[in-house]
Amino acid sequence: MIKLDLLRCNFFIKEVAMYKSTKIKDDIVWIGVNDRKIEKWESHIPLDFGVTYNSYVILDEKICIIDGVEEGENGDFFRKLEATIGDRQVDYIIINHVEPDHSGSIKSLLKMYQDIKVVGNAKSISILKLLDIDIPDDRAIVVKEKDILDLGKHKLTFYLMPMVHWPESMATYDTTDKILFSNDAFGSFGALDGAIFNDEANLNIFENEMRRYYSNIVGKLGAPVNAILKKLSSVEISCICPSHGLIWRKDIDKVIKKYQKWANIEAEEEGVVIIYGSMYGHTTEMAEILARQLDERGIKNVQIYDSSKADISYLFSAIWKYKGLMIGTCTHYNMAFPKIEPLLQKLENYGLKNRYLGIFGNMLWSGGGVKRVKEFADRLTGLEQIGGPIEVKGHVTPIDREKLIELANLMADKLIADR
């Protein structure tokens, strides 16, 4: 009776694992996992909606896994894998990118499957050693651009994409079904809420999380992204399977066009992001005046962010979306507001461009905050400054209000002229 119960239990576990796996094709299965417990990505980017670690297995004459998962999620991953392949052996694990959220399964796979080979490029095998994952020479297959890995029916080839977003990053392309396993490219924050494919999901949420992922993780690397987009432009793609987020099996051109815009730091649509730092409320009042006037002028997409509350990752996502940017700050020991300073530093590091910028702020005796924003703007030649910086001393007077209204009008004029 106990033996029968154990058999039933094992059968139930396999049935649940199979239910949580999803077929992309009859012989290609998603065996990824959702992580809803993780609080911050790389210890600094909040994950309010969690994240998914996508992994895929191809069932052919040879069995091949494409990318693993975070080590802490190996339990769910291996249950899905075993339920999918049964008692067959895994022949290959392709590592498109060696960060721990993709390479966390390698050590366990090497122990479980005695003949498995780790497939990666020379740099990936080298960097794995730095991450304490030492692959024996007889268990490593080093591939180069457009090498072929023959699984039987499926023939896989490889596209190196250095600095998208690590030097060893690459994509795997299934020449049989025209599927691109793109790793972090085309990825997104956010766990999957039932829907696996883009045509099944509410894209409003995922597009925001995809932009937040891109702008913060890949946003600095426009040139390498453009290079890989050019490289892939002649490749027929029926489906994009990234390592995080939704699988794109419809509207492939839509997601590629988004990447082209993001890589060139081109705004997606008309709108203004107003970001401010205020200690006593005066700069807050200035932001509200600007927003109200922009609305009066017919600018519908206006978003105000208090930098003391909004995480910088959300600020970046909004900045990447809209054409207009207005930054306001009080003065804090001759510097900008403490939460505005790191924003300026990161924007400069990422090379923000193709935006209209308005500058405003407040001071009482020494000033310096607005000057810091102006100096930042002057260094970024790809920004077009709108009007002159407005620095108010103390409370906002009627004259100050008129200056702010004029600044908002200048921003609105620019946006309307672009329609």
What are the functions of these language-model segments?
Residues 3-17:
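Short, Lys/Arg-enriched N-terminal segments with co-localized hydrophobic residues
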Residues 21-81, 171-174, 178-182, 283:
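Conserved beta-strand hairpin/beta-sheet module of binuclear metal-dependent hydrolase folds
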Residues 22-26, 120-169, 227-229:
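Metallo-beta-lactamase
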Residues 61, 72-119:
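Active-site metal-binding motif and surrounding structural segment of the metallo-beta-lactamase
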Residues 66-68, 90-98, 118-121, 180-183, ...:
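Active-site neighborhood of phospho(di)ester-bond hydrolases with catalytic His/Asp-centered motifs
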Residues 105, 311-315:
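Short acidic active-site motifs
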Residues 165-169, 185-219, 263-268:
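Active-site-proximal loop/helix segment associated with metal-binding centers of metalloenzymes
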Residues 192, 202-240, 244-247, 289-303, ...:
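FMN-binding flavodoxin-like domain, especially the glycine-rich phosphate-binding loop
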